[in-house]
């Protein structure tokens, strides 16, 4: 009995790091600003058949409606209440999405905005997605309800009430982030209200949460809230399962708050990942792909089993958040596909793929003055995600997760899951290759000259279909074929002018 108790205790301690994905699924996608009805359809028609593990959804709670500028994406990060009522849909639509996605083995992870409410300067009234009244001036949010007792006004020690110095951890946690009213998360009443909201979502069937602005909350306050959370719904999850937690902590080094303070609560977003990988792919600061041999902890990244990794996210793809100009996005499609391919092939971290929408970028003095633009819409009503005959998306939805190269690398990651990093090769420059045990092999050419090499793949002999240039269809290959000999070696030729200068083969792409 003692042994059993110890085991269950260990299981409980580790549970918040487990994404509870269906067996063999390893990557989630952020369907940024998608409507619940579209996500439900996407789970059934695309994500499940292609082996995606789950979806990070935009904040589902009621938020402020901002008219100047007109309906920006960031209004969803200014809560008014915890009613499930946003431009992505109402509670019935949310429930239907969670049901339908779970039923095909695709998990839902909610972006939970629990550090703050709306901005201090917002006008009192009912300009909210569900019409709830609020008055920021006197801290009145009857939709929760919160009042003046529930905010950190008295605790913050700066004259402005806002964060003025990121070298002061207390300011970062107790003062207002960008003028947003900071909740007093050390108060049990506030913790209970936040936990009630999250428990409502857990009972509906979500698998976990991205905790927005975790850097701006004390790790102990987060833990106190997590301790109040229900186990996951046993309709889809095994008894005693705890919600998967990944905390948004922007830590590029050199500040008072560090990611490792949060490891006890769950995984943490590793913002260094995309910033550093972007520099390598762009060949900035003398970086080159050959240096990626010890990618991961060897590059000063957090422990792999604590990291949630991504090439870009909804913030830094438009210059917000962290990472700066090195971040690769769909605007840099060729390098972006290579970077996402590298991420999905490499064993480090738990991976998230971005799915974006188009906006009219307009750089003035180095800043995109349209970085606020919200999702494709008709008079503020979010447009449906239409699907074109070639399986790309219409209505200005980018849908990177539907790009063949990215979709097929999600499958690659599933196939090689658990296999060791192996058979590294590089040319001391920007041509590199590596394998995952005897299940997969990938080759990159990011140099300005052709690659022509015979490499040890570690794979069994046979003919393989390159899943970057094509697909395995009815036992044949629509792309490049790779011939692996009895010695495990194969010859690779990649032109530096190829549309996608990388090749990937795996056990299930064998013809």
Swiss-Prot record:
Tissues where this protein is expressed: Expressed in liver and saliva.
Catalyzed reaction equations: Endohydrolysis of (1->4)-alpha-D-glucosidic linkages in polysaccharides containing three or more (1->4)-alpha-linked D-glucose units
Residues found modified as Pyrrolidone carboxylic acid: 16
Signal peptide feature range: 1-15
Residues at the catalytic site: 212, 248
Any Gene Ontology biological process: response to bacterium
Annotated residues for binding of Ca(2+): 115, 173, 182, 216
Matches recorded under InterPro entries: A-amylase/branching_C, A-amylase_C, Alpha_amylase, Glyco_hydro_13_cat_dom, Glyco_hydro_b, Glycoside_hydrolase_SF
Cytoplasm in keyword set: no
Binding, chloride: 210, 313, 352
Keyword list, A-Z: Calcium, Carbohydrate metabolism, Chloride, Disulfide bond, Glycosidase, Hydrolase, Metal-binding, Pyrrolidone carboxylic acid, Secreted, Signal
Site (Transition state stabilizer): 315
Compartment annotation: Secreted
Top EC class of this enzyme: hydrolase
Co-factor requirement: Ca(2+); chloride
Main localization category: secreted
Entry-linked Pfam families: Alpha-amylase, Alpha-amylase_C
SS bond partners: 43-101, 85-130, 156-175, 393-399, 465-477
GO cellular component, one term: extracellular space
A single MF term (Gene Ontology): alpha-amylase activity
Assembly and oligomerization: Monomer.
Family: Belongs to the glycosyl hydrolase 13 family.
Entry protein name: Alpha-amylase 1
Lineage, broadest ranks: Eukaryota, Metazoa, Chordata, Craniata, Vertebrata
